[in-house]
């Protein structure tokens, strides 16, 4: 009966802006388990995939390599660069990359009343598969704790925090779209991500 009550309360928290059942799936590890099953690889050259998450926005502003995506956002400057390659290590040119992240207070632009997009952008890799952009250092942030999932975390002694990260979606002709995240290596929540 307690389990039925918990699931009922979880369902009652769901609406067009909040999906408590998805949050429950995330915190129980089911979401990532399904993603891992659907994107199995033993190749160390292949980046680990993840789910899209609730803060992706299609068609972000396009920027050139090396430009800033931190329009009107305060925070510690952070330079991101990398190289996209295939499983043989060959560089991939013209890969379309969407990036998005939280600000230094742990909020995404869609959670604030901003007039335009911020801390999200689209760009393409160069002939050597390279990309680069300036942003601000993202911050860890808590998932919602005002519902049944928050109570579950509390009674099981788990914190509600996600480690600081930047989301990436990479799209290239002839390849499966990759959604992944890059985490700050020294984040205190890196080994205990709430989701």
Indicate residue ranges for each PLM-predicted region:
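Beta-strand-dominated extracellular/periplasmic modules and repeats
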Residues: 1-195
């Amino acid at each position: 009966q307690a389990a039925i009550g918990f699931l009922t309360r979880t369902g009652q928290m769901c609406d067009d802006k909040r999906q408590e059942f998805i949050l429950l799936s995330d915190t129980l590890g089911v979401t990532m388990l399904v993603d891992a099953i659907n994107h199995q690889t033993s190749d160390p050259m292949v980046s680990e995939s993840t789910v899209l998450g609730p803060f992706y926005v299609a068609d972000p502003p396009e920027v050139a390599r090396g430009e800033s995506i931190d329009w009107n956002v305060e925070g510690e400057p952070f330079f991101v660069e990398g190289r996209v390659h295939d499983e043989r290590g060959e560089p991939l040119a013209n890969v379309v990359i969407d990036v998005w992240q939280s600000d230094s207070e742990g909020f995404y632009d869609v959670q604030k009343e901003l007039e335009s997009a911020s801390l999200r952008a689209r760009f393409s890799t160069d002939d050597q598969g390279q990309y680069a952009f300036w942003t601000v250092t993202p911050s860890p942030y808590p998932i919602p704790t005002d519902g049944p999932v928050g109570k579950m975390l509390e009674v099981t002694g788990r914190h509600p925090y996600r480690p600081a990260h930047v989301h990436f979606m990479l799209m290239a002709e002839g390849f499966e779209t990759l959604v992944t995240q890059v985490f700050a290596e020294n984040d205190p929540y890196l080994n205990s991500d709430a989701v």
